[in-house]
Every structure is written in C-alpha cells, then in structure tokens.
C-alpha cells in the first residue's frame, strides 16, 4: 500500500497539471460512470491528501480516493484507456488514470470532513500556523502523542494506526524505530517525551524527503552504498533502507542478522542489537 508521501505527490501532481482547468472526467470501466458524468467539464480546483486519502476537488463536487493495496493513479500522455480504468481525469494532452482503488466515491463537504475526522495527524501537513487545517492537524498531533503515552500497545503497532498517525506505513515505522534505536515491541506508555518527540521529528523529516524525492531513503550519509562500498539495494520499493525487507541480512550498522515478525498485520523488521532501547 502506498505510504502518505506518495499520495501527497499525487495531490500535487493533479493540482499542478489540472488545477484551474476544465477537465474531462470519465469512467472507461463504467463503475464510476454516473458520478463522472456529474463532474465532466467542470473545473478541477485542487487536490489534497490527508494521510493515505486523496481528495480531488472540482467545482461540481469532490472525489474521495483511497488506493488500498493494489490501486494506482498514473499520469500518461493522452491515449486510449488501457486496462480497468475506474476514473480518468484528462485535458487535451495528459490523462490521469485511476485503477484498482479501494475507494473512489463522490462525496459532499460533510462527508469529506467526516472522513478526515477519523484520521490522525499527518506528518506531511502543516501543524498549526493559524489556518483551520493547520490547527486541526495540531490538535490531532496532541491527541496522537497523548494516546501513545497512555497505550500498552507496542510502539510499532501504534505508528501504523491511521487514526493516530495518518500516512505512516510499514516502511517508515520500521525505519524510524531503527534510526532511533527503539525496540518496536516497547509499549507506547514506556516512551519518554523526548523519545516521542524524536519519533515525530524523524518521521516528518523522512516523509518530507520522500515526498520531494519520490522514493524512500532512510540511511544516513555514512551508510550509503558509496560510503560503505556495498551494492545499491535492489527492491520494488526502491531507496536505501536499514532493515525493511532485509530479514536475515547483516545490519548495516553492527552486522547482526536482521530479524522479522508481524505487527499490526504487517511485517516488521529490526536489529536485536541496535534496537535495545
């Protein structure tokens, strides 16, 4: 499932390409045809992300998209649709095709607000700053940290709870905990205020980089392939990481074999030596 930085990049891409334009909105697959007909020819005003949820705003309504595990939203030169395209947003030269989403629905402003209300703080959205959205995110951050401090659940599970930390997925939670030397099985209530602040700060930094770069890189300069004289990582997820999907391989820092298990329904990876905190 794409993590939050991917959804934010898609929101930026939609706004940059189509923002302020009248666009064609169709459903080649047919499953969104009625809703698409209501939006066709209207102006796409902007798109925004909250966690792993994408909201595309038109003058005629809003589309709420969640890609789920297999969904994709791809920008290509305008051509005949390929495959099962649920939703196509296009101008005269470029089409954005949505395939296989978990959710694609036309929603009212009240329904959009209700969807956002269920989500936690988004590391890629402004916290505070005086705007309604920023102040909402600030309240969500306060709530997330408070609930984490009171919870007996493992921190590795809490970071995956989208009602607490929206947009954080398995890769980022795994890598942040490694970078800070924190055992993923530690109960949230055992974390100090300083540790929670470090988790939040590192999450913001890594996800912000991911949004800009379009890939997940979590290793520090001294652990890059060039610095260590090792081959670059080859993986569908791309990017250089410390422990994610490296079970049984030597830790890049201490050489101990990386361990793996399941937490919050997803694989998690850690170094038993580096993550004793």
Predicted segments, located by residue:
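Intrinsic-disorder/low-complexity coil detector
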Residues: 1, 27, 76, 80, ...
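Gly/Gly-Pro- and Ser/Thr-rich, intrinsically disordered tail segments characteristic of DNA damage-repair
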Residues: 1-109
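Phosphate/anion-contacting hairpin/loop surfaces
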Residues: 63-179, 187, 199
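Non-transmembrane, interaction-prone segments in cytosolic or luminal domains
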Residues: 8, 16-20, 32, 39, ...
């Amino acid at each position: 499932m794409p993590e939050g930085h991917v959804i934010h990049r898609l929101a930026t891409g939609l706004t940059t390409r189509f923002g302020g334009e009248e666009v064609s909105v169709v459903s080649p697959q047919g499953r969104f045809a009625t809703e698409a007909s209501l939006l066709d020819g209207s102006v796409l005003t902007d798109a925004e992300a909250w966690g792993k949820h994408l909201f595309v705003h038109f003058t005629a309504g809003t589309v709420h998209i969640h890609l789920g595990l297999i969904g994709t939203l791809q920008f290509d030169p305008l051509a005949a649709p390929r495959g099962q395209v649920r939703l196509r947003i296009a101008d005269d030269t470029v089409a954005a095709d949505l395939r296989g989403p978990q959710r694609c629905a036309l929603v009212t402003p009240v329904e959009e607000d209700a969807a956002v209300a269920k989500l936690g703080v988004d590391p890629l959205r402004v916290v505070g700053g005086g705007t309604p959205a920023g102040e909402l995110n600030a309240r969500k951050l306060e709530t997330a940290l408070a609930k984490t401090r009171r919870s007996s659940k493992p921190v590795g599970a809490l970071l995956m709870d989208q009602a607490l930390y929206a947009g954080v997925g398995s890769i980022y939670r795994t890598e942040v905990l490694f970078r800070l030397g924190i055992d993923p099985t530690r109960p949230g209530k055992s974390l100090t205020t300083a540790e929670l602040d470090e988790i939040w700060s590192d999450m913001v930094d890594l996800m912000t980089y991911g949004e800009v770069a379009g890939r997940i890189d979590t290793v520090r300069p001294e652990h890059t392939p060039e610095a260590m004289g090792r081959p670059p990582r080859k993986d569908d997820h791309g990017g250089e990481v410390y422990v994610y999907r490296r079970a049984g391989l030597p830790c890049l820092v201490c050489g101990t074999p990386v361990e793996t298990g399941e937490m919050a329904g997803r694989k998690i990876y850690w170094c038993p030596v580096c993550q004793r905190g």
